[in-house]
Amino acid sequence: MENASEILSALNEQDDNKDDSATASDSYNYDEHLWTAPSCAEKIVNIIKDKLSEYDKENAEYYGSNADEYNKKLEQLDYEFREVVENGNTKHVVFADRFSLKYLFDDIGLVYSATYPVCTKYQAPKKQTVSYLEKRIREEKLPVIFKNEITPSGSAEKIAKKTGAAVEVFNTCHTVTRKQFEEGVSYIEL
């Protein structure tokens, strides 16, 4: 059986869709955000199911049926992501933020440029990186620049102002508000 660290090791070997030009001077570290790709989330669900079933054999069938049901939702979500990418106008996405969607982008065939290649300690982005992102947005006529749901939008707003791109939030599926939690919002809805 795979465990989370084995999944992480295997997935980090796949690093084909990173746009090195935006962050050439930064070293790329592993990304612990496995859950951002539905295919990885399925593996995590199966690990949880197996562990729970191992420790609570009486309810193994219950855990199995719940995992199967949730994995069907994850498969549908994965399908919808792939459809959007297949029918989209571009495969390049710009993030004026820390990038935590490596596994999702690798899975669905998107390429990214970001102010930071991974979730590093927040600091002002490098000028050459910002200039590069602005150039890519203009050259490719990208209408949107993304930021994460919990990050202040300062960098994104500055780049948007210079390029005319709109700022949108890309939810990384690990933060919910109290209201969302009380309403039962989960990974699938985010």
Model-derived features with residue positions:
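Extracytoplasmic metal-acquisition and chelation regions
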Residues: 1-190
